[in-house]
Amino acid sequence: MVVLAATSSVMLLIGIDAIAASSSGPRAPGASSNLAVVSEDPYTNLGTYHRTQVEPDSSAFGSTVVSVFQSGRSYHCGASNIGWSVSHDAGATWTDGFLPSTTIHATPPGAWKRASDPAVAYDAKHGVWLAEAIGIPSCPFAGGDVFVSRSTDDAQTFGAPVTIRPQGPHQLFDKNWIVCDNTATSPYYGNCYASWDDGDHHLRLHMSTSSDGGLTWRKAIVPSGSCALGGTPVILPGGTVVFSTFPVDCTYGFQSWISTDGGATYSGPFDMPAIDGRGVHGKLRVWQFPSSDVDGGGTVYTVWADCRFRDFGPGEHCLHNDIVLSTSRDGRHWSHVMRIPIDPRSSSVDHFLPAIAVDPATSGASAHLAVVYYFYPNADCNLSTCDLSVGFASSVDGGRTWAIQQLAGPFRTSWFPLTTQGHMIGDYFSVSFVDGQAVPVFVVGTEGTCERKAVTSCNVWTASATIPMG
């Protein structure tokens, strides 16, 4: 394990630990022995890449972790269906399934052609797992209806989808997310909040709230000038919702939105730090979405990929991306950007697509932070030479010092399904805390040609690791 101080760009090697997690069922081809196989793609329909799973989200409560992901990714939009997998032993073993009554490829079949953008949350008050996604009626038109599938048996099964908001004419719903208020002392305990944007109306934000375990949803009032392509809402211990968003072409920085009335109304935007990012090579589909979580004391931590610390003079601006961090106590005021010192500033390593989790049993100077990300050892690579790996950074002192390790890789970007925006591992992935351990869920693969409509071409699946902290 490599331990680094956040205030220094010097790496101090003090020993290496091998973290292992057992796999459930037959191991996927080429899977590393220290990873658990979360799920594999069973679909063989025409029009999608087979044996592909991308874009996993995950959430945890107690000793249970649930992950949702696209299964059978297509070139134009979405996937054959949304899969889920559940672990009741902190990520050691997994049991998977696929949502019913969603797409025409589901069992039983549903009405949508594809599904995309999966996210998952647990509602402790009502004892319900909620898997949210976009149901896409036709491709290549990518938008669709926002829906949630419910599980009342601890993610052993999921029911038919409940539509949160159907997409209307001249709308393009995209980049949804979901979170639930699980603090028993919160005045809004049991509220769940769903978010998405409308690409046909200047990326206007939409929020919706459920207070009955996802059975019914009511629309929130969001300022008419809102503009963002996705983001991650979190909930402070007192019930305030803080929604950090990615504005794309709207502004030069992230923005946050606040609800203090249980999701009835939102105020904002509040300015977050500016973005300074570098495009990723290797024909890989990468966005600069923020990832946020909150500690037990109510501090919000938001991470993203940023190259501001790789500026070495004229002609050498923004050479490679780091993972950076900003914090807030109220969602309105944000700290200066801090570089997570994964590698020296002079290195050629490019880091991107980060996700953060904070152990809710910790806070402040003792907060346990887990950040998972993808990286290239050499940023200036191409489709044939880019070596993609999964990295993990952890801190047990609120971000003052960090321990670094590699979880998986290297992979070639060409092993992953090609989309209209490049080869895809996902626009996001995630990590959760279970019993004080970090459990990231991510996409791995082995060599394949990933030709469209070729049943045996790809070898891409979801995997996890269980990582003790401290």
Predicted regions and their residues:
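C-terminal PAP-associated
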Residues: A21-G470
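Bacterial N-terminal signal peptides
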Residues: V3-D17
